[in-house]
């Protein structure tokens, strides 16, 4: 896999996204993804200072990084088997076509390099049969166990299958859409359990700013009511920890209505639905009077 992307390690037993490389940690920090350092010393496992890699990510962090093209999943054999079993025939065919297209691009690059060499020697590719055979021999690609000729050895189809497994089994789509909405608004997000929330939102890097919002899990925008006592309790909780108490939901019906107007059928699969549509999100902030 090209080193321009961050490697996110997944284990079939825990399902927790981890980042082990310090350069990758620095890179995703620049993208606004925080995570939590969870590495400790074997002789002092209870210590809570000077924690190091790996960096533990929220599932929303990992999905956002992969869908944005900034990262890829590194997984064990068991998870690979589960993901491969969910691939469709069309995805396998697309995978093969992408692989062959990459090989052909490599061959074309070798042809151009060889022609430039011949031109530098004031020769042409149409001299003798011997020279043409030598030229053709140089166009074959060796695919060793650790090939440097073809860097993209990780099939995109498997990455999509792993992503589908994560979204279907472990991720709430409404929570992810609120997460994505806040990320698009340039907020930094981390887990908010210590403040009675799903996320804690910062207006910038947490080393420079205090968190401003305690974001609650996504609500059913059309059917779930917001109890007045819940509003009062949330407002007082937000005031007590010096944060806005934020609730929100996803307006799925608007996206489905737009798809119907365009004579498109919304995909039934959760991931395909996420990729094909972009339903709008509404969020509301609540604070107790006299806040601050």
From Swiss-Prot:
GO MF terms held by the record: lyase activity; nucleic acid binding; tRNA-intron endonuclease activity
User: Which biological process terms from the Gene Ontology are attached to this UniProt entry?
Assistant: tRNA-type intron splice site recognition and cleavage
Does the keyword Lyase feature in the UniProt annotation?
yes
- Catalytic residues as annotated in Swiss-Prot or TrEMBL: 202, 210, 243
Q: Does the keyword tRNA processing apply?
A: yes
User: Got a GO cellular component term for this one?
Assistant: tRNA-intron endonuclease complex
Name the EC number(s): 4.6.1.16
| Keyword terms of this UniProt record | Lyase, tRNA processing
Q: Which family does it belong to?
A: Belongs to the tRNA-intron endonuclease family.
User: How does this chain assemble?
Assistant: Heterotetramer composed of SEN2, SEN15, SEN34 and SEN54. Interacts directly with SEN15.
Name-wise, this protein is tRNA-splicing endonuclease subunit SEN34
The source organism is Eremothecium gossypii (strain ATCC 10895 / CBS 109.51 / FGSC 9923 / NRRL Y-1056)
Recite the lineage of the species: Eukaryota, Fungi, Dikarya, Ascomycota, Saccharomycotina
| Chain's gene name | SEN34
């Amino acid at each position: 896999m090209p080193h321009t992307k961050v490697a996110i390690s997944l284990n079939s037993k825990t399902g927790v996204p981890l980042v082990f490389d310090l350069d990758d940690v620095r890179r995703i920090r620049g993208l606004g993804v925080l995570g939590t350092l969870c590495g400790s010393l074997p002789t002092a496992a209870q210590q809570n200072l000077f924690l190091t890699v790996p960096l533990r990510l929220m599932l929303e962090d990992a999905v956002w990084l992969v869908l944005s093209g900034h990262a890829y999943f590194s997984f064990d054999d068991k998870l690979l088997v589960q993901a491969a079993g969910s691939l469709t025939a069309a995805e396998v065919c697309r995978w093969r076509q992408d692989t062959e297209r990459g090989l052909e691009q490599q061959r074309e690059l070798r042809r151009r390099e060889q022609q430039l060499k011949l031109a530098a020697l004031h020769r042409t590719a149409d001299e003798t049969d011997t020279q043409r055979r030598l030229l053709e021999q140089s166009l074959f690609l060796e695919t060793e166990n650790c090939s440097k000729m073809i860097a993209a050895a990780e099939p995109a189809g498997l990455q999509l299958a792993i992503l589908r497994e994560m979204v279907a089994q472990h991720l709430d789509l409404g929570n992810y859409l609120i997460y994505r909405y806040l990320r698009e608004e340039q907020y930094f997000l981390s887990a908010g359990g210590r403040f009675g929330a799903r996320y804690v939102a910062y207006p910038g890097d947490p080393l420079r700013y205090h968190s401003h919002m305690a974001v609650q899990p996504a609500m059913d925008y059309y059917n779930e009511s917001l109890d007045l006592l819940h509003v009062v309790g949330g407002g007082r909780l937000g005031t007590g920890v010096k944060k806005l108490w934020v609730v929100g939901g996803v307006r799925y019906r608007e996206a489905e209505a737009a798809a119907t107007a365009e004579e498109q059928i919304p995909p039934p699969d959760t991931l395909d639905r996420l990729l094909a549509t972009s339903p709008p999100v509404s969020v509301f902030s609540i604070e107790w009077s006299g806040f601050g």
